[in-house]
Amino acid sequence: MSDITTTIPPDDASRKLTVANPDDADMRHLSIAGGTYTILVTGEQTAGRYCLTDMLVPSGGGPPPHRHDFEEMFTILEGEIEFTFRGEVLSAGVGATVNIPANAPHSFKNKSNKAARLLCMCTPAGQDEFFLSVGDPVASRSAPPPKLSDAERFERVQRAKALAGKYRTELLV
C-alpha cells in the first residue's frame, strides 16, 4: 500500500470571502450582445482562478460565434438557451449545466419569447476583464440597454474584435 501525502498550502489570509448579489448597488452591470451581464466574482477576487457572471439574456439575445482558450460553464437559472457547439445545436433549460471546452467554437441565443438568466463561470479568469472592456455600463440588472445607433453598434463590434485577442478570445464573425 502506498502512502500518498498531499501538502495543502497555508491559508492566504489576504483573500476575503466574497458574497455577491446581482441586485446589489455596487455590482457592475454591463450591456453586452443585447443582454445585461453582472460581474459577480472577478478574477482579482479569486487570484485568477475563475470569474462568475450573471447573464440576463433577452429574447433574441446572445453573442456571435466565438472561441477562447479557457473553459466556460453555463447554468440556466430561468428560461431556455439554444447553444451551438462545433456546429451542433442543443437547447438547455432551467437547471441544466453546459460546459464548453477550451478552444471549441460556440455561441448561444435565447430563442424564446421571454428573458433567460444564466450563470457563466470561466476558468481561468479573464472573461470578466473582456466584458468590462467591451460592455456599456448600465445602472442595474433590470435597466434597459442603451439605445445605440447603427454606427455605435458597429463601433462596439469593432472594439470587441480589436480587444478579443488580448483576452484569449477569437470572434468567428
Language model: regions and residue ranges:
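Ligand-binding loop in jelly-roll beta-barrel domains
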Residues: 46, 82, 102-128
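A short, N-terminal "cap"/entry segment at the start of jelly-roll beta-barrel domains
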Residues: 1-49, 147-173
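Short, conserved beta-strand element in jelly-roll/cupin
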Residues: 52-59, 67-85, 121-122
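Short histidine-centered beta-strand/loop micro-motifs
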Residues: 41-42, 62-68, 109-111
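Structural motif
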Residues: 36, 73, 80-82, 89, ...
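Tight coil/turn sites that cap or link beta-strands
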Residues: 58-60, 95, 103, 113
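Short acidic-glycine-tyrosine-enriched beta hairpin
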Residues: 20-21, 80, 87-105
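A contiguous, mid-protein "functional segment" used to position or interact
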Residues: 114-161
